[in-house]
Swiss-Prot record:
Pathway(s) this gene product operates in, as recorded in its UniProt entry: Porphyrin-containing compound metabolism; protoporphyrin-IX biosynthesis; coproporphyrinogen-III from 5-aminolevulinate: step 2/4
Organism of derivation: Orientia tsutsugamushi (strain Boryong)
Protein name as it appears in the record: Porphobilinogen deaminase
Reactions catalysed, as given in the entry: 4 porphobilinogen + H2O = hydroxymethylbilane + 4 NH4(+)
Other observations noted: The porphobilinogen subunits are added to the dipyrromethane group.
Note describing how the cofactor binds: Binds 1 dipyrromethane group covalently.
InterPro entries: HemC, Porphobilin_deaminase_N, Porphobilinogen_deaminase_C, Porphobilinogen_deaminase_C_sf
Assembly and binders: Monomer.
Keywords (A to Z) from UniProt: Porphyrin biosynthesis, Transferase
One of the Pfam families matching this protein, by short name: Porphobil_deam
Length: 298
């Protein structure tokens, strides 16, 4: 039996898809192959995502292939997966999560606070932008689209003073993160919802594929992302809303989660920490979002 695995065609996406293929082949004894698919998000590099349709542009063509049965599963970076999926599709599994953090990539500074006054920092993420400006209002934030390789090369070529990249992506691409790279503490920058996790999407009614996905699902990662996605779904924020969060296991079937919600124009910035049992994680994430909504409408 051949399992057709749909993926974006970028180097990082294909590495992540290969990790899923390896799980399918090794654990299930099946033959999985990768079908690379060009997405709109990959093709349009000169505009902010929120001006052209959001992160869903990295999924649109892949999900179309899934709905039309030209692939059997789709592999995504979970942080790119919107709160709500097209009818007929659902998240079927996640692999064990990688590093959840963001890294400051800069030749001239090891920490955000060490950047010179008015330093130019490239990012297209509104989440990263607002957290950078909360810490350093003097920074000059400029649009910085492109895959990891493109953004890394812009640092090498001194086009900007710094950028921020997901640690998991750099590690999966085998970058030497001892050069120019330093983890940003969560006290300064919370990651995107789902950051570091590789997600598998499938057709809800596929009675063959769904059980296979369950067999390679990493249960603890799955439970923790329910907390984060409960928060995300309740806010139903698009990619022009600065939103972040991370749920971490703390033992005894319990988790701790940190959430942030901001405004692009810096009119407000909310932060909260919650704890609870994993079996109640989704509902606790929902409640955290509702508490922010209440503060907005007081």
């Amino acid at each position: 039996m051949i399992i057709r695995v749909g993926s974006r065609a970028s180097r990082l996406a294909l590495i992540q898809a290969q990790a899923v293929v390896q799980k399918i082949n090794d654990l299930l004894g099946l033959n999985a192959i990768i079908i690379p698919i060009k997405t709109t998000g990959d093709l349009i590099q000169n505009k902010n995502l929120y001006d052209i349709g959001g992160k869903g542009l990295f999924l649109k063509e892949i999900e179309y292939a899934l709905l039309n049965n030209t692939i059997d599963i789709a592999v995504h970076s979970l942080k790119d997966v919107p709160a709500y999926l097209p009818d007929g599709l659902q998240l079927a599994a996640v692999l064990e999560r990688g590093d959840v953090g963001d890294m400051l990539v800069s030749k001239i500074a090891n920490k955000i606070t060490d950047l010179p006054l008015g330093a130019i920092v490239g990012t297209s993420s509104v989440r990263r932008r607002i957290q950078l400006l909360m810490l350093r209002p003097d920074l000059n934030i400029v649009l910085f689209r492109g895959n990891v390789d493109t953004r890394w090369n812009k640092i090498i070529n001194n086009e900007v003073d710094a950028t921020v990249l997901a640690a998991a992506g750099l590690q999966r691409l085998n970058y030497d993160t001892s050069r120019f790279c330093n983890i940003i503490p969560q006290s300064e920058m919370l990651p995107a919802i789902g950051q570091g996790a590789i997600a598998i999407e499938a057709r809800k009614d596929d009675k063959l594929i769904m059980p296979l996905c369950a067999k390679i699902n990493h249960q603890l990662t799955w439970q923790l992302i329910q907390v984060e996605r409960g928060y995300l779904k309740t806010l139903n924020a698009d990619c022009n809303v600065p939103i972040g969060g991370i749920a971490s296991y703390i033992g005894n079937n319990s988790f701790e989660a940190k959430f942030m919600l901001g405004d692009y124009n810096m009119r407000y910035f909310f932060y909260s920490e919650v704890r609870g049992k994993l079996q109640h994680g989704y509902d606790i994430g929902v409640e955290a979002a509702k508490n922010f909504q209440k503060r907005l409408f007081i």
